[in-house]
Curated annotation (Swiss-Prot):
Underlying gene: cobK
Taxonomic superkingdom: Bacteria
Keyword match Oxidoreductase: yes
Pathway stated in the Swiss-Prot or TrEMBL entry: Cofactor biosynthesis; adenosylcobalamin biosynthesis; cob(II)yrinate a,c-diamide from precorrin-2 (aerobic route): step 6/10
EC number: 1.3.1.54
NCBIfam families xref list: precor6x_red, PRK08057.1-2
Catalyzed reactions: precorrin-6B + NADP(+) = precorrin-6A + NADPH + 2 H(+)
Gene Ontology biological process terms in this record: cobalamin biosynthetic process
Protein name: Precorrin-6A reductase
InterPro entries attached to this UniProt entry: Precorrin-6x_reduct
Disulfide bonds: none
Name of the top EC class for this enzyme: oxidoreductase
């Protein structure tokens, strides 16, 4: 039996868990960080909660042995990816990172790149005054000192950090339709969209809406992966990678 630890919390992680449940000789357990109050649970065994850093993750895979780790977390979950690489190296087990392809600007789109949240906050005052902030609830405090701007902040759960003084919080979970995103931006007179380059096989609805309305996008670039990290682009690639383990 090949035992796989899936570091999850994304749609790809749920799809991978469901697919591996039907593969003979493979047993997968999914781990969720527990940062969302009502997470969408994957098929199969699930653990919820952090590991306590790389040391805790290494101890977890020692106490509950696995043959490999698939990191299918969000592309911006940089710390857990570093921890996974560290723990896998210590335990001498293979790791693959499932990273969906990045988005790229299309004709008619107006993108401005930011290295991280702090860089985005510094660039934002020169781009507009009514901001649609779609980075999730973590990191909202990077914009808390921008008192001259107004923000529409969308997140699944309320932020537990400082928020910009002039802001409206919209609690909602996607996916969203292009027509709804367009109407939302028009209603709130949005003139800049701030988002992360989460990527995926299809363009996000908010990017399509911003393009249609001629609204510039401040796109936060992904953090780099640990050196020499093996990656796959999609669930099919992750399944094929697991298949190489079962044939060893």
């Amino acid at each position: 039996m090949t035992r796989i630890l899936i570091l999850g919390g994304t749609g790809e992680a749920r799809a991978l868990a469901a697919a591996l449940a039907d593969v003979p000789g493979v047993e997968a357990v999914s781990s969720l960080a527990g940062r969302v109050r009502d997470p969408r649970l994957p098929v199969g065994d699930v653990r919820i909660g952090g590991f306590g850093g790389a040391d805790g993750l290494a101890e977890c895979v020692r106490a509950h042995p696995v043959d490999a780790i698939v990191d299918a977390t969000h592309p911006f979950a940089a710390q857990i990816t570093r921890n996974a690489a560290d723990a896998a190296h210590r335990r001498g087990i293979p790791l693959v990172v499932l990273r969906r392809p990045e988005w790229s600007p299309r004709p008619g789109e107006h993108w401005h790149g930011a290295a991280d949240l702090a860089d985005a906050a510094e660039l934002l005052p020169d781009l507009g005054t009514r901001i649609f902030l779609t980075i999730g609830r973590q990191g909202v405090d990077a914009f808390a000192d921008l008192q001259a701007l107004w923000f529409l902040i969308r997140a699944i759960d309320p932020p537990d950090v400082a928020m910009p003084p002039h802001s409206t919080l919209l609690l909602a979970r996607g996916p969203f339709a292009v027509a709804d995103e367009t109407a939302l931006m028009r209603e709130h007179r949005i003139d800049v969209l701030v988002t992360k380059n989460s990527g995926g096989g299809q363009t996000d609805a908010k990017l399509d809406a911003a393009r249609a309305l001629g609204i510039p996008v401040l796109m936060i670039r992904r953090p780099p992966l640990p050196p020499a990290t093996e990656t796959v682009d999609d669930v099919a690639g992750a399944i094929a990678w697991v298949g190489t383990l079962t044939r060893r």
